[in-house]
Amino acid sequence: QSTNDLIKACGRELVRLWVEICGSVRWGQSALRMTLSEKCCQVGCIRKDIARLC
């Protein structure tokens, strides 16, 4: 997936892309809930979360 696809992704779609990129990602339910509730679409936040979750 390209970075542009990640920038456009929000909520569940962003989580789906994370799973595709990272493979089997082990994350807590709290992290997943935070991602879905914040619906973070900002490049910096996405990069930070990918680094943290992957």
Swiss-Prot record:
Recorded hits in CDD domains, A to Z, give: IlGF_relaxin_like (cd04365)
| PROSITE patterns according to UniProt | INSULIN
GO cellular component terms, alphabetically, are: extracellular region
Name the Gene Ontology molecular function terms of this record.
hormone activity
Residues where Pyrrolidone carboxylic acid is found: 1
What quaternary arrangement does the UniProt entry report? Answer: Heterodimer of a B chain and an A chain linked by two disulfide bonds.
The protein's name is Relaxin
